[in-house]
From Swiss-Prot:
Pathway: Porphyrin-containing compound metabolism; bacteriochlorophyll biosynthesis. Chlorophyllide reductase is composed of three subunits; BchX, BchY and BchZ. Forms a heterodimer of one BchY and one BchZ subunit. This is Chlorophyllide reductase subunit Z. It catalyses: 3-deacetyl-3-vinylbacteriochlorophyllide a + 2 oxidized [2Fe-2S]-[ferredoxin] + ADP + phosphate = chlorophyllide a + 2 reduced [2Fe-2S]-[ferredoxin] + ATP + H2O + H(+); bacteriochlorophyllide a + 2 oxidized [2Fe-2S]-[ferredoxin] + ADP + phosphate = 3-acetyl-3-devinylchlorophyllide a + 2 reduced [2Fe-2S]-[ferredoxin] + ATP + H2O + H(+); 3-deacetyl-3-(1-hydroxyethyl)bacteriochlorophyllide a + 2 oxidized [2Fe-2S]-[ferredoxin] + ADP + phosphate = 3-devinyl-3-(1-hydroxyethyl)chlorophyllide a + 2 reduced [2Fe-2S]-[ferredoxin] + ATP + H2O + H(+). Belongs to the ChlB/BchB/BchZ family.
Length: 491
């Protein structure tokens, strides 16, 4: 491909999204005019539904003169727009980094953070930014703040680390993790960075345990805080193990809550498992391309807990680039009945629509892409997430079945069935074998309709060419690019 498909932003984006989520902190972006338009004004509208100018951000607006004279003067001008009584942090873009920008002028309360956007990705910088916020505004000269003793009889306290802007489905997952914590009898001490105030950073040490919501970032701060920490769970079994371990750390009994959840939040899981869709679970394969948090968790739940066959699972990991061309090939080879991913995978899936048979269903599970999830009813984590995810998979299976039905408008516009097709039209053995291989790539649920459509198309192509029999080359031409490639191992 001539243009590389990106699946994450640079370090500058991650730092900005972390800093802007904290109350009481102003952000100066040291970059050219308009450098905030894409990450802040534009993208956050399509991911977090934030209106323009919602966040306390100002830009230095670098021009040609700053290339040789430095950025201190432009930074002083930008700082005067902000509230001088509030702390501010300057975040350097790639251009400012290349010319040695980000130097804070005298007489201002601006502190400097270097995102290293040239060599760090969004999640690496976000992880450092979270740790930096605590070390600069929670510690005193590098010393940990004193921990406030929990009053006798008070509930154990838990921090939730990771929620910030630009994270897929953050609101729903945060709501569910908070519900689980409170459900077993604990209370949330702080959510950081989203919604936390700069003046409260020292209170992070008051928690008895920490929950890191994402594998991509947040663990660095959890290590600094020095308290036991757990990864937020996805799936029924993982959530149960998570609650029991959290209860053990906090000295609480989670079993009454787990028992109540089985008869309430998790009831739809058992109902869906025993309903008519159970016939599809063993044959309806799925593929997922998402952050490591979602890719690992969702695959473990659907494949491990429920037994759905996984065609492939590709995790986007911090610090390493995803081979999107390989992902494209996996989608083409396996044609999963349900595909979860970002706009990249949605485009790759759309490229297959010229093929035969029903179209796979797509479920948004990752950025990049326009997907606003401000409502709290679409979790993937926790018990509620297990229910919602299985519900969406079942709906996706129904949608795949819908595509089998012929539309009246399509039937009217389609060419009439050729009367010259012969049911006894001879096929070469290797042509039949090629057809079988193509059909095997379709999910079991849709193989019958795909086989019929492919057979009719092959015989029509042979008749149109004046052939007396269907040969292998005719079938391969129907398959298009990628025919004959061996299926790769699941990632």
């Amino acid at each position: 491909m001539l243009v590389q498909d990106h699946d994450r932003a640079g370090g500058y984006w991650g730092a900005v999204y972390a800093f802007c989520a904290v109350k009481g902190l102003q952000v100066v972006i040291d970059g050219p005019v308009g450098c905030e338009n894409l990450p802040v004004t534009s993208v956050l509208h399509y991911t977090d539904a934030l209106p323009p100018h919602e966040l306390p951000i100002v830009v230095t607006g670098l021009g040609e003169s700053e290339m040789s004279e430095g950025t201190e003067a432009s930074m002083s001008r930008a700082w005067k727009v902000l509230d001088p009584a509030l702390p501010a942090v300057v975040v350097t873009g790639s251009i400012a980094e290349m010319i040695g920008g980000g130097v804070t002028p005298q007489g201002t309360n601006i502190q400097r953070f270097l995102p290293r956007t040239i060599d760090e990705d969004q999640w690496e910088a976000a992880d450092r930014a979270m740790t930096w916020i605590f070390s600069e505004f929670g510690m005193t000269k590098g010393r940990m703040p004193p921990e406030a003793k929990r009053p006798e009889g008070a509930k154990p306290r838990v921090n939730i680390l990771g929620p910030m802007y630009g994270v897929f489905n953050m609101a729903s997952d945060l709501h569910e993790i908070r519900r689980l914590v409170e459900g077993i009898g604990a209370e949330v001490n702080m959510v950081m960075p989203l919604g936390a105030h700069l003046a409260e950073m020292r209170h992070l040490v008051n928690a008895d345990a920490n929950i890191v919501m994402y594998r991509e970032f947040g663990r660095g701060l959890a290590e600094v805080l020095g308290k036991p920490y757990l990864q937020a769970p996805i799936g029924v079994e993982s959530t149960t193990a998570f609650l029991r371990r959290l209860g053990e750390i906090l000295g609480l009994d989670p079993e009454p809550f787990i028992e109540r959840e089985k008869h309430s939040t998790l009831k739809p899981v058992w109902d869906l498992w025993r309903s008519v869709t159970q016939d599809f679970f063993g044959t309806a394969n799925f593929g997922i391309v998402a952050t490591e948090t979602y890719a690992r968790g969702i695959r473990n739940y659907l494949e491990g807990d429920l037994g759905l066959p996984c065609a492939f699972a590709v995790a986007r990991k911090r610090g390493s680039k995803t081979d999107n061309e390989a992902v494209r090939g996996l989608i083409r080879q396996h044609r999963p009945l349900v595909l979860m991913g970002s706009i990249n995978e949605k485009i790759y899936l759309a490229e297959l629509k010229a093929g035969h048979g029903p179209q796979p269903s797509f479920i948004a599970a990752s950025f990049p892409g326009a997907a606003i999830r401000r409502a709290t009813g679409t979790p993937v984590m926790g018990y509620a997430g297990a229910t919602w995810l299985l519900q969406e998979v079942c709906n996706a299976l129904f949608d795949a079945l819908f595509h089998i039905l012929p539309l009246g408008t399509e039937m009217d516009s389609a060419a009439a069935t050729p009367t010259t097709l012969r049911r006894d039209f001879p096929w070469d053995a290797d042509a039949q074998a090629a057809l079988d291989r193509i059909v095997e790539e379709h999910p079991v649920l849709t193989r019958i309709s795909a086989a019929r459509a492919l057979r009719d198309a092959a015989e029509k192509a042979a008749l149109d060419a004046g052939a007396e029999r269907v040969v292998r080359e005719t079938v391969e031409a129907l398959r298009g690019p990628g025919f004959g490639e061996r299926k790769g191992e699941n990632q």
